[in-house]
Amino acid sequence: MAPAPPPAASFSPSEVQRRLAAGACWVRRGARLYDLSSFVRHHPGGEQLLRARAGQDISADLDGPPHRHSANARRWLEQYYVGELRGEQQGSMENEPVALEETQKTDPAMEPRFKVVDWDKDLVDWRKPLLWQVGHLGEKYDEWVHQPVTRPIRLFHSDLIEGLSKTVWYSVPIIWVPLVLYLSWSYYRTFAQGNVRLFTSFTTEYTVAVPKSMFPGLFMLGTFLWSLIEYLIHRFLFHMKPPSDSYYLIMLHFVMHGQHHKAPFDGSRLVFPPVPASLVIGVFYLCMQLILPEAVGGTVFAGGLLGYVLYDMTHYYLHFGSPHKGSYLYSLKAHHVKHHFAHQKSGFGISTKLWDYCFHTLTPEKPHLKTQ
């Protein structure tokens, strides 16, 4: 028989006030206390919005308006649970049963995502690398991978390979922006020589000269095409559902994108690491050289590479930045947060919502919860 779990810690109002005075951000839900100090900078609504509610009951805020939080967001909150509030005056506790009853009326299909994470009883052993474990989850993988957690992930046993699977955000502009500048300078010089022509691989009679004035347009075309590629990869590759009986396809999905949905605030896994990125970028470059004349394909590629850099930087900012309310980035962040926590089958655009508009995959205005 398993031992009974230890009783929850309890805190008096004066103890909570001391922590608040020291700069901690504690909130409560009924009598349940949560320490959100480490989460405030990640809060989708902004740090100030959360700090303004320090010490308060957030039950009503979870239900909105202006925003009704998803079951995944409520489950995420439980990872910051620290104990119970004791010695509270009766008047301030009168509404607790009502608040708890309302917040628990979630869509039954979403109820499993509301469960608190028990690290010792989870489907995987978090003390070991996850990549070799997830393939055994089978039919449970899809539900498990879309239950986000607050802790970082380790994929590999080898420290070297593990290191290559992670990176800091600023490695992306440091490595790839100089390449964008070099390619742009090199191919513009080629255009300036006046020898660039289209269709030379098919005919010598009907070729079309490409003047250097076309360089900016081709570059911008590459950036625009990247936004479409970004959307298509995210929607059809990253969000494919691997067969439950395929150990290796589940592993592949997890290493490509599942890990990010499992640990959305693992800062070392938010942008594409340079080594695997080099392989993918190299394939794109070769494809452009095969399809188009060298200078034309290279220019489109350079624009696309800049689009990739902007995508990765935008993605990182959407997770860790605090855009001003009402700004485009604020709207984009809300769009992406809903993709992670409520609507994983929509909201595939990262750097722009353009293609979500075009293909009708915008995240709904309301989270996937039935209002009461």
Curated annotation (Swiss-Prot):
It catalyses: a 1,2-saturated fatty acid + 2 Fe(II)-[cytochrome b5] + O2 + 2 H(+) = a (R)-2-hydroxy fatty acid + 2 Fe(III)-[cytochrome b5] + H2O; hexadecanoate + 2 Fe(II)-[cytochrome b5] + O2 + 2 H(+) = (R)-2-hydroxyhexadecanoate + 2 Fe(III)-[cytochrome b5] + H2O; octadecanoate + 2 Fe(II)-[cytochrome b5] + O2 + 2 H(+) = (R)-2-hydroxyoctadecanoate + 2 Fe(III)-[cytochrome b5] + H2O; docosanoate + 2 Fe(II)-[cytochrome b5] + O2 + 2 H(+) = 2-hydroxydocosanoate + 2 Fe(III)-[cytochrome b5] + H2O. One of its GO terms (molecular function) is iron ion binding. Binds 2 Zn(2+) ions per subunit that likely form a catalytic dimetal center. Induction: Up-regulated during keratinocyte differentiation. Its cofactor is Zn(2+). GO terms for cellular component: endoplasmic reticulum; endoplasmic reticulum membrane; membrane. Pathway: Lipid metabolism; fatty acid metabolism; Sphingolipid metabolism; galactosylceramide biosynthesis. InterPro entries: Cyt_B5-like_heme/steroid-bd, Cyt_B5-like_heme/steroid_sf, Cyt_B5_heme-BS, Fatty_acid_hydroxylase, Scs7. It holds the Pfam family FA_hydroxylase. Its EC number is 1.14.18.-. Heme binds at H43, H69. Optimum pH is 7.6-7.8. Zn(2+) 1 binds at H234, H239, H257, H261, H339. It is linked to Spastic paraplegia 35, autosomal recessive, with or without neurodegeneration: A form of spastic paraplegia, a neurodegenerative disorder characterized by a slow, gradual, progressive weakness and spasticity of the lower limbs. Rate of progression and the severity of symptoms are quite variable. Initial symptoms may include difficulty with balance, weakness and stiffness in the legs, muscle spasms, and dragging the toes when walking. In some forms of the disorder, bladder symptoms (such as incontinence) may appear, or the weakness and stiffness may spread to other parts of the body. FA2H is stereospecific for the production of (R)-2-hydroxy fatty acids. Plays an essential role in the synthesis of galactosphingolipids of the myelin sheath. Responsible for the synthesis of sphingolipids and glycosphingolipids involved in the formation of epidermal lamellar bodies critical for skin permeability barrier. The histidine box domains may contain the active site and/or be involved in metal ion binding. The N-terminal cytochrome b5 heme-binding domain is essential for catalytic activity. This is Fatty acid 2-hydroxylase. It comes from Homo sapiens. The gene is FA2H.
